[in-house]
Amino acid sequence: MSVEEWKQQKSAVDFSQDSVKKSTALDILHSVFGYQSFRKGQLEVIEATLAKKDSLVIMATGGGKSLCYQIPALCFSGLTLVISPLISLMKDQVDQLLANGINADYLNSSQTFEQQQLVQNKAMSGKLKLLYISPEKALTTSFFHFISHCKVSFIAVDETHCISQWGHDFRPEYTQLGGLKASFPDAPIMALTATADQATRQDILIHLKLSNPHIYIGSFDRPNIRYSLVEKFKPMEQLSQFIAKQKGKNGIIYCNSRNKVERIAESLRQKGISAEAYHAGMSNEQREFVQRAFQHDNVQIVVATIAFGMGINKSNVRFVAHFDLPRSIEAYYQETGRAGRDDLPAEAVLFYEPADYAWLQKVLLEKPDIPQRQIELHKLQSIGEFAESQICRRLVLLNYFGEYQQKPCNNCDICLDPPKKYDGLVDAQKVMSAIYRVGQRFGAMYIIAVLRGSQNQKIKEYQHDKLSVFGIGKDRSREYWQSVIRQLIHLGLIKQVIDHFNITLQLTLEALPILRGEQPLQLATPRISSIANAVTIPKRAVTNYDKDLFARLRFLRKKIADKENIPPYIVFNDATLQEMAQYQPTTEQEMIQINGVGDIKLKRFAQPFLALIKEHQIFRTTKK
């Protein structure tokens, strides 16, 4: 049954009008999408759109942004255009809409001329409710000629942070979308994004020429994601230990270079872990293969550059690890937002080394001194402060976006394992003395080698084994001294100087009172072990479900998805399966009460799941 057939059955509701009541939106939410209630902010945004108002919607990833425009699209009588930046994201959204019986399609460069003509014919004949297009396509003369033959009721512009030079993912073609307002003066425009600070919001309003818009700024908080930072000591070993703890869960590892992506993916494969590389240097066919394998649960982990980002709508990504420092908090937030989109517990882990920050800073400082450089330096400084923070990471993250909270989250490494302070004056003096004695011409690892009394050849050649500081820190590990040096850098007592490919440590003027012992210094006890173990369970998460039944339901879902040639989460996501495993419905009347089961999916997919649940119950009864 399609949505159009479903509409005909709902004869009491007049879908021919471009104005519908709140009850209609709620009815669509229940019957088409299978959810029992709206999330915070969704209904007010939908009602504003149905009242023909433009809107700006800033809502966290996983917060239900898509429903904000998909439900009005079903209420309006004409076509809804959705501007989306990535081909993969378009296809994924369309697949999910089709699974719910909604007539949707896309136009992009991956299609042949004949395929595009077929889609255009469907749109012009009124057979489509939603049409996804790229911003580049939306600006072409041929597109405007075609779309002039369609009744466009509504326009949604997704990922609108791309419109702003302040945004972390600037796309120049987005800035030209303001022409949509003139071309479709009667169609309300909705701009959507998960990440936009004040400057970015202003750019969106100006460039899209939104008229007296309804502005909804939701919470940026993702309470089901635990944020942790790992100080890099033996990075590959630490990453391998973290992956081992995931026990086969799906995840994404982000790196800043293609070479590193390839090396890490190969290293994981050698350990028997299902992992694939993804970066811009691969062919389109290779990238599509990896993305498809990941979405279909045929690959556990994707190791990627930022090229692998917005196109991922997979709901059961359980962790995102950043092996390198991102360039901004917006980028970090957007990328970690790929985890836990089903509202179940997920992890975001940042592997951090101050040298990563120094290299990124050097790259930016070598750019021409233009406003864009200052913007990027400001954003880099903010992510550096996030990494070095000694207070709740979630508070730092939310404060950056102007959402001020006072209560710690109890779901980050700082809250779960608060830093312990100690009198670090002597340790600081040892490090600073070593830096000074070797002429302020060497990097952190060399300073540590001197402190620990290493017998390496380079130290002997420079006769630094004869210095008074040689070996005065041999009672502490290399990792311990790395942590001390990082803190001294963060405190501004020593600085990293980059010259070509070398990073040297030098003292700042602020170091002199410490060297002389004229003022005290508190340092955090080095956190040699890394990732905190506790996980806060979000309010919507199901906890007392039958684990054996859940595993069987997941196996059945994969079997059905492979047969239908769609990703498993499009059948039902993990949160829906967990509800099934808890409440164990055995009739269609019971199944329709499960979140994520709408009329279309009930008829298309429910019977095998109902049969499996009945079989499981009989087996359990017989076993008892």
Residue locations for each model-derived region?
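Accessory DNA-binding and partner-docking regions appended to nucleic-acid-acting proteins
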Residues: 1-25, 376-377, 406-624
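Helicase motor core with emphasis on the C-terminal RecA-like subdomain
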Residues: 19, 23-32, 36-40, 44-56, ...
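Flexible coil/turn residues that form the inter-helical turn or adjacent wing/linker of helix-turn-helix
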Residues: 185, 247, 390, 440, ...
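C-terminal accessory regions
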Residues: 379-404, 549, 555, 562-564
